[in-house]
Each structure stands twice: as structure tokens, then as C-alpha cells.
Regions:
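Flexible, glycine-rich loop/tail regions that form catalytic "lids" or insertion modules at the edges
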Residues: 224-225, 230
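Short basic (Lys/Arg) and small-residue
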Residues: 218
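Ribokinase/PfkB-type carbohydrate-kinase core domain
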Residues: 1-30, 34, 40-214, 230-236, ...
């Protein structure tokens, strides 16, 4: 891993790397074994998924400037294979692998090797990389580094010291513990984003957009929050506004998509 240029504030993306594989197919007949279509693959491509998609969005939102570091769990990446017919999802096949966790020592060494890191984005998909996330968050706090968690667990006690938790409606409703002073950034699809903090809810409506595919939009939100928060004067509210606009671009694209800096509309 290359060290960052010392003058640039940087982002660390840590978590579960996955691979999103897409197969464009045609379905012209049913199989004789069951009333199911036979899919003929016409073309295919892959994109980084999970924490990899967060990092890819960070890269593009920064305009291609390499001011971020990635830290993934060691081992094979889980693969999500999506089969599309006429731009519609016909089937999905997952191969899940459990990675070795990122240890506090490796995490600390990464931060100390890259002292310009100001924000850490934890992308937790439950594939093993962030088994020790509570201790990793505490390391961020000790070093005065902002950190945002995209959660997998439903019990959020281990996330209680994070700067914020970024979740969707389903994850929020499934949570079994939320700290009374925890900042929660909840995405609500085409209804925008809510900031829940100290018992108050602030709603940030999204701009009207044609929703084509919501795949990976949460990763775009997490990346955009991190990019904005590398500025010491950036508030959580300003970061949410920027993330909302970036997500509006992501959902207008088919499949996993990394939003470019020049695609994000002005406030």
C-alpha cells in the first residue's frame, strides 16, 4: 500500500470487500425441468461491491485524486451475481465467504502510516472484516478521527462512539439498541435523508430523479459523507446535503455505479 501525500486530508475505507457481477441475458424459452426461463448470457462485467464500491465512489467523488486508503478483511471476496433481462433483474446468485477480521494492530499501523487520514468509513456487510469494529472505533476516537459506520449488526451498542451511523429504514427499524446521543443518518430512498440526533429529526428532501436502480446507493451516500467531512469545517448537516445530491445521481443509473465529482449538482 502506497503512503499518501502528506499535505492532503485523506479517507480510510475499511470493511468487507465484495464483487458485483452483472450478466446481461436473453430469455427465449422455458426449461423442460421446471417452469423457469433459460437465460442465455450475452455479455458480462464486474464492479467492486461493498467496501470496494464505497472506495470506488470516494475515488470518483474526489475527481480521481488518490487521497484515500483501503483496508479489507483478508480472504476471498464474496460475489453477488445478478442476471438481467431487458434491464430487469431476473435472478441473483450469491457466493459468501468469511474474511479474517481487521485487527486493531493492522488498523493502528495503517492510520500511523497515513497521518493525514481525517475520516474513516466502516462498511460492514457481516463478512468478517469488522468483527472487532468496537475497538477500531475507539482507536479513531483516541486519534480524533471522524468515523461513520454503515452497520450490519442490529445491536448498535458497539457503534456507540462513532461520529454517525448511516443506515436505511429497514436497518433502523431492525436495530435493538440506539444510543440516546447517537447521530443516525437514515436514507429513505426517494424521500431523502433524515438526521436523527438528541431526540430530534431533521428531514433533507431529495431532488426529483428517475429511480432506475437503488443498488449501491447507500455506498454512495457513505462515500459522499466521508468526502465532505474531510474538511474540518464541514458539519454533518452539510455532508448530508452533499450525500443526498450524490445519491440522486447513483439511483438514476443501472447497477452498481460510482458517481463522479462533476455529476453532483450544486446545492
Amino acid at each position: 500500500m502506497d503512503e499518501l501525500q502528506p499535505q492532503r486530508p485523506a479517507i480510510l475505507v475499511a470493511g468487507d470487500h465484495m464483487i458485483d457481477a452483472y450478466y446481461r441475458c436473453e430469455a427465449s424459452r422455458l426449461t423442460p425441468e421446471a417452469p423457469l426461463p433459460v437465460l442465455k448470457v450475452l455479455s458480462s462485467y464486474t464492479m467492486p461491491g461493498g467496501a470496494g464500491n464505497v472506495a470506488n465512489n470516494v475515488h470518483h467523488l474526489l475527481g480521481g485524486v488518490e487521497t484515500f486508503v483501503t483496508l479489507y478483511g483478508e480472504g476471498s471476496s464474496s460475489i453477488k451475481r445478478r442476471y438481467l433481462v431487458d434491464h430487469h433483474l431476473a435472478a441473483r446468485v450469491d457466493n459468501d465467504y468469511i474474511a479474517k477480521p481487521i485487527t486493531p494492530k493492522v488498523f493502528t499501523d495503517t492510520l500511523e502510516s497515513n497521518p493525514t487520514i481525517r475520516v474513516v468509513l466502516f462498511s460492514d456487510y457481516g463478512k468478517g472484516a469488522l468483527e472487532e469494529i468496537e475497538e477500531l472505533i475507539n482507536i479513531c476516537i483516541d486519534k480524533n478521527i471522524r468515523c461513520i459506520v454503515d452497520p450490519y449488526a442490529t445491536h448498535w451498542f458497539e457503534y456507540r462512539h462513532a461520529t454517525a451511523i448511516k443506515c436505511n429504514d429497514r436497518e433502523y427499524n431492525a436495530s435493538t439498541w440506539i444510543g440516546p446521543h447517537q447521530a443516525v443518518i437514515k436514507t429513505k430512498g426517494d424521500a431523502g435523508i433524515e438526521l436523527i440526533r438528541n431526540g430530534e429529526v431533521t428531514h433533507y428532501p431529495t431532488r426529483p430523479a428517475q429511480v432506475v436502480d437503488v443498488t449501491g446507493a447507500g455506498d454512495t451516500v457513505l462515500a459522499a459523507l466521508g468526502v465532505c467531512l474531510t474538511r474540518l469545517d464541514c458539519t454533518v448537516e452539510e455532508a448530508i446535503s452533499y450525500a443526498n445530491r450524490a445519491a440522486g445521481v447513483a439511483v438514476s443509473k443501472l447497477g452498481t455505479y460510482a458517481v463522479r465529482k462533476d455529476e453532483v449538482p450544486d446545492a
